[in-house]
Amino acid sequence: IALSLVGSEMCIRDSFYGCKYALPLMRDSGNGSIINISSISGIVAGHNFTAYNSAKAAVRHLSKSVALHCARTTKLVRCNSLHPVFAKTEILEALLSDTSNDMLSKLERQIPVRKLAEIEDIANAILFLASDESKMITGTEIVIDGGLSAQ
């Protein structure tokens, strides 16, 4: 098995430093919601993305650990993670531009609802987690995967 951490360390490093530097500011202001963006790959492993899967799983557990820390030190700062499936983004479109429509169809077939996530699906989850409507939600993951993890 060929393993490489190239690029994957950034996945956890950015979330770690985001939490580290946001927490004091949020405590000073009295409240806040940290939303770490992970991936469905942090919940459902794949055979060819070992480092990426591991890094995204680390973001999931970092979020849980920060949530528990905050719950014990201040009741007003929450921390959760978001785990979207493949989404219609410019990055994905660029990756697929060199391939046929077969690759897009293959991705869609992996998802029980047979379609990719829309950016709005992810944005709506972020808005919910950032709002007071989620004031009792901390230390959890929101999975936006069209049923992929239910299989």
Per-region residue spans from a language model:
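Single conserved hydrophobic/aromatic residue that forms the stacking wall/gate
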Residues: 1-7, 12
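Alpha-helical segment proximal to the catalytic Tyr-Lys
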Residues: 24, 68-72, 135
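Short, small/polar-rich loop/turn modules that mediate ligand/substrate recognition or access, typified
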Residues: 71-78, 137-139
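Active-site loop-to-helix junction immediately N-terminal to the catalytic Tyr of the SDR YXXXK motif
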Residues: 45-53, 65, 95
